[in-house]
Amino acid sequence: MLEERDADELYRLVERNRAYLARWMPWAADQTLEGTTAFLRMTERRRAENNGFEAALVCEGRIVGAAGFPGVDWVARATSIGYWLDEEHQGRGLMTQAVRALVDHAFDEWDLHRVEIQAAVDNQRSRAIPERLGFVEEGIRREAERVGERYLDLVLYGLLAPT
């Protein structure tokens, strides 16, 4: 789990990947150490309230990315998964493995019914993860996210709990 004490390392990772992440993530272009610390405090609160969590992806003792649940709708028994990975560590299956573990947690530990993932239409690497894991493409949310001065269309993927 990511915790406030990870702020420096996580921020340095964002700094190294800022140009890459800023193409897809609305927060990346101007993320600060203070903003990273505030995000980690928020995710600790969510975890304490049983309303999601953020996990670190660690490779060779270093944080190389993050993946987690930004919240849980306990009435609908649904959640979404968000993720990002250091550009140098892509293409190794790390994020697919992490997202698979999160999906298993959502269905097996939380007994949820539905998991969603959204990815920018043009972000093929991000889209490949839900596609590999059997998520169903459910539609396009046109100009659904503003990143810098442009709007991105997002593909919505959904996966239902096995029956």
Cite the ranges covered by each PLM segment.
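GNAT-family acyltransferases
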Residues: M1-E88, Y151-T163
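Positions that flank functional sites
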Residues: A29, V121-D122, E145
